[in-house]
Swiss-Prot record:
It comes from Feline immunodeficiency virus (isolate Petaluma) (FIV). Residues 807-856 are cytoplasmic. The gene is env. The record marks R611, A612 as: Cleavage. Residues 662-680 are annotated as: Immunosuppression. GO terms for cellular component: host cell plasma membrane; membrane; viral envelope; virion membrane. Specific enzymatic cleavages in vivo yield mature proteins. Envelope glycoproteins are synthesized as an inactive precursor that is N-glycosylated and processed likely by host cell furin or by a furin-like protease in the Golgi to yield the mature SU and TM proteins. The cleavage site between SU and TM requires the minimal sequence [KR]-X-[KR]-R. InterPro entries: Envelope_glycop_lentivirus, GP41-like. Glycans are attached at residues 220, 258, 269, 274, 298, 330, 336, 342, 418, 422, 448, 481, 499, 518, 531, 548, 551, 717, 721, 729, 737. This is Envelope glycoprotein gp150. The surface protein (SU) attaches the virus to the host cell by binding to its receptor. This interaction triggers the refolding of the transmembrane protein (TM) and is thought to activate its fusogenic potential by unmasking its fusion peptide. Fusion occurs at the host cell plasma membrane. CDD domains: HIV-1-like_HR1-HR2 (cd09909). The chain crosses the membrane at residues 786-806.
Amino acid sequence: MAEGFAANRQWIGPEEAEELLDFDIATQMSEEGPLNPGVNPFRVPGITEKEKQNYCNILQPKLQDLRNEIQEVKLEEGNAGKFRRARFLRYSDERVLSLVHAFIGYCIYLGNRNKLGSLRHDIDIEAPQEECYNNREKGTTDNIKYGRRCCLGTVTLYLILFTGVIVYSQTAGAQVVWRLPPLVVPVEESEIIFWDCWAPEEPACQDFLGAMIHLKAKTNISIREGPTLGNWAREIWATLFKKATRQCRRGRIWKRWNETITGPSGCANNTCYNVSVIVPDYQCYLDRVDTWLQGKINISLCLTGGKMLYNKVTKQLSYCTDPLQIPLINYTFGPNQTCMWNTSQIQDPEIPKCGWWNQMAYYNSCKWEEAKVKFHCQRTQSQPGSWFRAISSWKQRNRWEWRPDFKSKKVKISLPCNSTKNLTFAMRSSGDYGEVTGAWIEFGCHRNKSNLHTEARFRIRCRWNVGSDTSLIDTCGNTPNVSGANPVDCTMYSNKMYNCSLQNGFTMKVDDLIVHFNMTKAVEMYNIAGNWSCTSDLPSSWGYMNCNCTNSSSSYSGTKMACPSNRGILRNWYNPVAGLRQSLEQYQVVKQPDYLLVPEEVMEYKPRRKRAAIHVMLALATVLSIAGAGTGATAIGMVTQYHQVLATHQEAIEKVTGALKINNLRLVTLEHQVLVIGLKVEAMEKFLYTAFAMQELGCNQNQFFCKIPLELWTRYNMTINQTIWNHGNITLGEWYNQTKDLQQKFYEIIMDIEQNNVQGKTGIQQLQKWEDWVRWIGNIPQYLKGLLGGILGIGLGVLLLILCLPTLVDCIRNCIHKILGYTVIAMPEVEGEEIQPQMELRRNGRQCGMSEKEEE
């Protein structure tokens, strides 16, 4: 074949034609590729030998010119060796291709790349020597640049994979801790709860909430017995009472005067004292008595600090109680409150008893009845008084009005009242402090507006049948000679007038103090003088306990009080603290546990058969504990933005719910709907104190499942009984209780690490130093901060645009050209904008051990 080729040197065959056309393209090639991209017809896929011969016949003149151009190259000129350059670029492409195959793991290519795509001839020629290129010939091409990046990325990837394998092997035996699991458990009786009240009509319970949305969800979970909200009834009642009167102490001043108090010897020896007397606006106190203190306002009690309420009746979880009528003063009638029959088990004296210490009567068939009774009162007054000049309206002239004098001793006042039904007060309890003796009843009476009187509401007390012996206790009944009892008739007959009086004060015990509220001035403000009438206005939900009375069959009789009537109600049975406690007994205080130790089997558990899905309802009030529990203001303000928060966190809820994979946890009590109020209840507050400790233990505030390294787990001698899981046949209470000790120990470990962590102390010190350095920023006005920040932001954006725009444009251009199948290069600069008539190809270097003629 070699002899035939030498015999006909003028004819150019397909093989030589293919190389000459490659040279023609390479003469205009730079680092970025050919200037005018062309297609070598001899390299078209699927071309046959016949087609190659036809191309040789057609392109023979062009091929002859290309051969002559190559042969006329002069050695002494410094033109770039285009042909050598093209061969180097071809080899560099193969290097990049080799790196790509190494990156994807296709190592067979590295061994067979020299055999792929090469045409082999069995000819008798000398073996070519290895070619050498200097750095100037090589330059820095795009292939070299991206090849280096590819190599660096490959090494980094394998390093990361190797590190991940090592980390996984080290943490395979780690203990799993579930932070803030979606379940609730009862609180301890020793825990402190933070609460606040809310009532839309009451300023003392409305100044920080605005509108309340009761977050509730139905659930069927079983919670073991724990403390209820009734355990804190006395503390809640005392706080509500202070709230009711706090507004009045900050109100307007009704009267002010100065008085001089003298001592026993007059003003001698500086025993005189000048006292400034300030009487506040009694209108405020009277409003409190008319509305809140007497329970005419519905009040909801809401917990803060991450605690929740579990209603044992409705099986619901919520932050707030249902609206309750909470009278803060003793009353004859009140909200539903039952009494207890077994008096031996009653430890709290405030709880009403259904028996009595000195009576043989037995009350059974007790039931709650609404107060379908009305009281009518008519006030009459003798007429001593005086004429008063008043202006009735701007249309009329001044006129004289008769105003009776109610302060005169000559004035005779009567306030008879009657009931619409018989009321028998069957027993007596220790009600008000300084209680009225005898048979008595009290109620609220409403006076309509008239020409001479304004609309008002008074508290009226009626008393009759007072016992004559004050050393004995007035007792309802007519059995004589009862030890320590003064028998009185406690029946208030219908349509019978009884002498009553306006209650101008009441006495309450707040904390350990007995406080007397004198309402005389407040009553005077409503113009009680004259003749007027009123009708009781008991709330519709109020009533009394009506019982049947049966005398005991005990043979020992005559020394105990028998039934005063066959039916009766319990007089003064409503005690505010006891009533509040009974209303709150149905609300169990629960919380979301901070940690739950989870066996590894739980995370890997696969149910054998399809089970019912566990629906987790997530109501988002995430800042309840952050808002400052117990401070009062804005403690539950997040509830008003519930809908906005729900829309914002909906995507996060779905991701977290999917990540928990609760369907794999076959807890008996968790196969129903469970409510989690807040994804991170108190998480932010706890993280502030346990950040460094949790970091050392392998957790952060954004993780719900944390794998504590086994080394740390064994260092603190913590073990978990893997058998408690029992393949999922465990209740919520059992799981929590069996790991409760470990949870407490885990919390103590966190506190111990936090207090003794050197890194934590160092971090705090560095934070303080940084704060000292940047403290001057706080002295800059706000508008200057905004202006400076805007200028820096714009400048940084322009700088990044200048630096990154060329690279971005080149990247986009290269991607487009790669998709099209070729690469466009830039035209080489030519001085004088004139193209040389003849572009000669020169070698910038020489081939190792080979002359120029031999190379050609």
